[in-house]
Amino acid sequence: MADKELKFLVVDDFSTMRRIVRNLLKELGFNNVEEAEDGVDALNKLQAGGYGFVISDWNMPNMDGLELLKTIRADGAMSALPVLMVTAEAKKENIIAAAQAGASGYVVKPFTAATLEEKLNKIFEKLGM
């Protein structure tokens, strides 16, 4: 299991969704969670460093989750950062686009705590965390 001190950044323009994800992470033992309301806000925080995992929505103002993902993957300092997309975008082409852009995983809203835990564990296992 991953280090419980792992620092998460939860990115979503909907504050209730950020709170839901934060609370689910807390239930899983991860208390080091910060929030960003869009991709621009997230990038500013990520560039300051210290994050070990990003959970991002797709549809957001200013910079959407897919653009954020592509920017993270193109940045040498952040390119290996795990990014889990959590989004209402359930179409096959969206899932393929996220995978091609380098998403570590993909969860469609609405989802359960068990689904989030399963996806996180798969990513942790794949990355040897």
Curated annotation (Swiss-Prot):
Cofactor note (record): Binds 1 Mg(2+) ion per subunit.
Q: Which InterPro entries match?
A: CheY-like_superfamily, Sig_transdc_resp-reg_receiver, ST_Response_Regulator
User: Per UniProt, what is one GO molecular function of this protein?
Assistant: phosphorelay response regulator activity
Q: Name one GO cellular component term.
A: bacterial-type flagellum basal body, C ring
Any Pfam family hit: Response_reg
Tell me the outcome of changing residue 95 to A/V. Answer: Enhanced CW flagellar rotational signaling activity
Complexes and interactors: Interacts (phosphorylated CheY) with CheZ (via C-terminus).
Its protein name is Chemotaxis protein CheY
